[in-house]
Amino acid sequence: MSHLVAGYPTDELSFTAARALVDGGADILEIQLPFSDPSADGPAIQGACTEVLKRGYRTADGLAFIERLHKSFPQVKIYLMSYGSLVYTPGVENFCRRAAAAGVTGMIIPDLPFDHDEGLTAACRANGMENIPVAAPSMAPARLDLLARAGFPYIYAALRTGITGSDTTIDDSTRRFLDAVAAGGSKIYGGFGISSGSQARALSDQVEAIVAGSVFVRLITENKNNPDALYKTVRAKAEELTTL
């Protein structure tokens, strides 16, 4: 699963990056709607969100971008990632209807607790989508077990505490955490600090898919003045991460 910030640095270059990811083997795109206080994200994604929002980018613009991706790459699942405020503002049910109409398959809203989601899970399912809750190593064991056995088809496992961006070491504690998240039979997406093929291979026997985001945003930032280089570097990294 590959993560992009919608509209960064422009819609066209964001689309170029998405095409590079798909051509490089990504079968799930996680598209982040820019938010002013992305509390789970590191400097690369925070900076991208800030730049896009300065242009006056709106939720409607992000959904239009997702719809374009869905029409261009119908074989690819699209997950929408953002924060609770963007979901609450238009109303949870209204937001979910709009997301589903744009082609969204699932929602990842990391600041909404799985058991106090203001009706997000029900609204997602009513519109043919899944809410994908986030599990973190900092969760108390009893609460983590409650999430694991809550019946969600998919759970996003944040592989360490803190924010996205810096590299994560895959060790025995990581594996024990993933075992705990999977205890109820949910399929697991593992992310936070994934940037290399070796990390992806180390996780491949325990997760449905790895999630990589900051590494792609950094490549986009480094090459935003050269679309050809942007495409080539993003595609090469996607190929590295999907070759197991």
Language model segments and positions:
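Short beta-strand/loop segments at the ligand-binding rim of alpha/beta enzyme cores
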Residues: 1, 72-83, 124-134, 181-191
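Conserved N-terminal beta1-alpha1 strand-loop-helix module at the mouth
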Residues: 1-75, 89-92, 229-239
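Conserved, mostly hydrophobic/aromatic
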Residues: 2, 21, 32, 99, ...
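Glycine-rich beta-to-alpha transition loops that act as phosphate-gripper elements at the mouths
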Residues: 5-10, 81-89, 113-114, 135-139, ...
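Catalytic cores of alpha/beta
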Residues: 11-23, 139-150, 185, 190, ...
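Glycine-rich phosphate-binding active-site loops on the catalytic face of alpha/beta enzymes
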Residues: 26-38, 106-108, 116, 155-165, ...
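Active-site-adjacent beta->alpha loops and helix N-cap segments on the catalytic face
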Residues: 36-47, 54-67, 87-93, 109-126, ...
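Alpha/beta catalytic cores of nucleotide-metabolism and tRNA/nucleoside-modifying enzymes
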Residues: 179-186, 195-201, 207-244
